Every structure is written in structure tokens, then in C-alpha cells.
Amino acid sequence: MNASNNISKFPDLDNSSKLIDHILDSDDSEELDELPDISSLVPSARAQSRKQYLKNDSSNSSTYRWNIDLLSSTATIDDSVAKRRKLAVQNLLQYDSTQTFQTGDEIDELIGKSVGSNVLNVLRSNPIYDDDLRYEYCSNSKARVPDWNTLKAECLKDNDLEFNEGIIPTTFGDLLSAKLVPLDIALSICSLQFFRSLGDTTCSEWIANLEKIFYSYKSSSNNLNQIVRFIFETTADMIGIDLAKRQVPIQLERTSASENLKSNLKIKVINFLKCCGTLYRFSDDTVRFEMIQDACRILIDNQVGSFCKWQFSQFMELPISLNPDFLISNIHKVSESPRVWVTILSSLSRSCQKFRKKIAFTLFVGKQSKNDDSDFSSLCQRLDEISASCNNDYTTLLYQIRTFGYAVDEKHFKTNERLECLLEKLRKIDLTISGSTDHLLLSRCEVKDCIHRLFMVLYYLNTNSAPELERIIESDLPNNNKQKDRYFKDKTSNLSMKENKSFSAKKVKKGKKKNKRQAYKR
């Protein structure tokens, strides 16, 4: 089957979104309404080295319809359209009856040009926006401050010793390295000091001391799991984790703004994630999954999530490196919301890209990857389900498509027919999004843009188009360098000409003065 017949064109977009139409309607092609023939592109070009491809290729880049200049101009147009949409909606949110008629007219005109003439009434009838969705997992009000006498008795137990609260963590670490403190006593003192410094910057040093003790303890104690659980649960209580929410999938709610965030809660939560990174190695699977759940929920928390992204990515490297199958098989229990999935996936570090695809596949499809042909069938089936169930819920659809973007891998495109099949399914989903201005909300425009961009990314990454683009870019670079050299050369020559002129002018003035003096003497 010819790809150009199957993937004929994207649907016509409205006046406010010309992302694909601008590309397809270019004068650089004779077939204006067709995408490039995917089946005619040679997949082996991907395996060639870039230099070898450039050496062997003798095609004329001017005839290549999807050229870099066209893409650049399209991206610029798309960016300006997106800004116009957002500006219109921002103005709309500030619009009320107290404003002057002139301001109302201006806003109506702006919305009419940017997102459709009837969108004003639609937005007024649905005043709740996605930004109102919130999730709270840690809070000052639920933080349980332990009774220090009880905690001291729990930590020190039967050890008859005086507890020195002023001991410095570096000094204590030196004592540990020299093995001058028995392990039981060292663990008791270090645990108590860790709890006391949870909201302090010295907490990281006490966590490092705990790690030293655990490595020594691992081979000499059978109750290490109990010790780890005690420290984990006590710390979770101190940062105010809602234990009832730990047992159910994350559900975003429309609630009012939460209480003011105390400054030390942010530090406590960051130190809690650092502590989980240390405890994870010495925990059983039950505690490990609770740590993973807590880390994901803290990331989604509206109060503290934005402060903890880096620490979250550092923690998640542990389950990915130590037992990835355990993580992948349980990650779907955290939430059923595609919006939560995208937040988690986008916060993983770059070193986890391989496993991020596996995690995304599990979340998107609902089951683990088998690394065989059934994975492709599962992706296609899920895309068909999304296409059939799209019911004007554009926000959910947007995050589903973004999750698919994380899940899809080059191993799924063993043949051109597979690539053609996935692109056709994306086009089908795009067609299900109504083009009526009555439903032309910002979320609808965003999901169409996301589908179009993903379509182009899949096309370029899985055909020989990527080397073609590289060749075009590289062919432009020398010209740019020559222009720069010419610019500096002209600038230098202009400066030298100015210097010569000024020098000549000074010489003339000097000669005139000399003649005047000689005439005066005479």
C-alpha cells in the first residue's frame, strides 16, 4: 500500500492554527496535499554514518520539499499563533462586567481573531480551568512532631550513655571511620541526630553517616529492615505525609489554595527524599514501593513538588538501576491520570531515557513491554481506543499523546509499513478533534499542535530525512561563516580607511600651521 495514498494530508485547520497546512501547501512541491511517500524512503540510510551519507548523496536539496527553511518559518508562525491564543485567554480570564465597553470590545475582537468568535460564551459557561487542579500530600498541619523523650528512649533503647546534642556530624563520621563507636550505639545516636536536623542543612551529613552504619550493619544484624522502616515512617510523619492518600492512586482535585508553606517544610521534604535514597538499598520490597509512591506523590504536590524535581530524579535512579522490573511492574499503581504520568516521566533524568520508554509504555498500554512484535500491536490497539473514546476531553487527550511520545521507540519501526500505520493512527486521532469554533478552546489547539509535532518527529527520526536535514544545515554553515568573515573584514577595512583619513587630515593641518609660521617670520 502506498503511503502517499494512506497518509494523504492532515485535516484543514482553522485560521488560528496553520502548523501543518503551511508545510503541505508549500510551492516547493507539485503534490501540495500529500506527505512525502514514506514507503519510497530507504530505511538503511539511518544505519549509514553521517559523513558517508553526505559523501554518497548527490540529490539537489532545493527540490526537497520538507526543507529546513520551511520548517523554521512554520515553527515561527506556530509560535506566534500560540502566543496570540494564550494572550486572548489571559485577557478573557480578567474580563468582567465592571470593565468598560471599549475593553470588552477589544477582547471580543482579539478572541475573534485568535481563537474564534463564539469561544467567549463557551469559556464563560465553563469557568473552571485545569490550573485549578491541585494535589496535596505533605502539609504543615498534618506534620507530627515526635516527643523527643520517647524518641530518645526508642533510639537509645537499653544503651546506658549520655546523649550529646552538640556533636558535629563530621566528627561523628571520623569516629565511625576509625571504628571507635560500637554499631548499636552509633546507630542510636546517628538516628536521633538525623531526626533533630531534618529541617536543617546539616541533615545531609547525618544521612551520609547513616549510610556508613547501614553498610556495616548489613552483615551483622537481622533486624535491619525493622530499623529502616522505623526511620522511614518516623520521617514521613515529621513532614506531614497523608498516609490515607498513599493507599489510593493519585487523583487531582479542584480545591482552593492550600495553607502558606513554611520555609523549613521544603528543606524537610528534600532531606526526606535524600534519606529515602539511602534507605532504599537496605529495604524490603514493601518499603521500597512505599518510598517510590511517596517520591512520586511529593513531585505532584502543588506546594513542594517544584522544589524537589532534582532530588526526585536522583532518587528514581536507584530503583531504575537496582531493580527496574519491580519499578515498571508497580509504577501504574501510583496513578491512572495521564497528566500525572507526564509529570513523572518528564522529571526523570537523562541517564534514564531507556527505562523511561519502558515506564511510559507500561503506563500508556497498561501492561509491561515484552520486547517482541506484540508491543507494536498493543500500541496500535491503545491508539485505536483513544481515537474511539475521544469525547472533547482535550486535556486528557493531550497528556495521553505526550505519554505515547515517551513510549514509542525506534524498535517499533522495523518496517516502513509499521511507521506508516502509526502515522495513520495519529492522523485519525487528529481528525476526531472537531474544527468547530464553538469548541475551539486553548486545550484543543494545544493537543492538535502536539499531534502534528509528534507526527513530524516520528517521520524524521525513522526515515532518511534526518541526514538530509543535517546536510542542509551543514551546507548553510560555511556561508554563515563567510558572511561573518566578510563582515569583520569590511569592518576592519572601514576602520583602517577612517584611520588613514584622520592621519591625512592631521598631516594637512600640520602643513598649514607650518606655512603660517613661515609667512609670519617673513
From Swiss-Prot:
GO terms for biological process: DNA damage response; double-strand break repair; double-strand break repair via homologous recombination. One of its GO terms (cellular component) is Smc5-Smc6 complex. Keywords: Chromosome, DNA damage, DNA recombination, DNA repair, Nucleus. It holds the Pfam family Nse5. Residues 482-522 are annotated as: Disordered. It comes from the Eukaryota. It is found in: Nucleus; Chromosome. Residues 504-522 have a biased composition (Basic residues). InterPro entries: DNA_repair_Nse5/Nse6. GO terms for molecular function: chromatin-protein adaptor activity. Residues 482-492 have a biased composition (Basic and acidic residues). Acts in a DNA repair pathway for removal of UV-induced DNA damage that is distinct from classical nucleotide excision repair and in repair of ionizing radiation damage. Functions in homologous recombination repair of DNA double strand breaks and in recovery of stalled replication forks. May prevent formation of excessive Holliday junctions or assist in their resolution. Component of the smc5/smc6 complex which consists of two subcomplexes, smc5-smc6-nse2 and nse1-nse2-nse4. Interacts with nse5. This is Non-structural maintenance of chromosome element 6.
